[in-house]
């Protein structure tokens, strides 16, 4: 909500926050990374604040809901938060997909009542 508190009700939600932890991997290259989040709403459409919000995955341009390009990964566990504050948030099931370095690195599902 407006005070950045977690809520379960869609009518109280003003934005969606996606929290994740990039696991430690001493074999991975270090440096800045871009993370993309796709949030698929109850109607099956990807929530996006712009029609230009696109990134490449498996040779196709696909829409993203939120992105961060300033993630400085140094091979150690790193918490990251991304925010979506576009279209009105309605009740229902939302599917969340997380992408980095050309891979889908995570998925989750949330339900707002």
Where do the language-model regions lie?
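Membrane-proximal structural modules of membrane-associated proteins and complexes
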Residues: 1-113
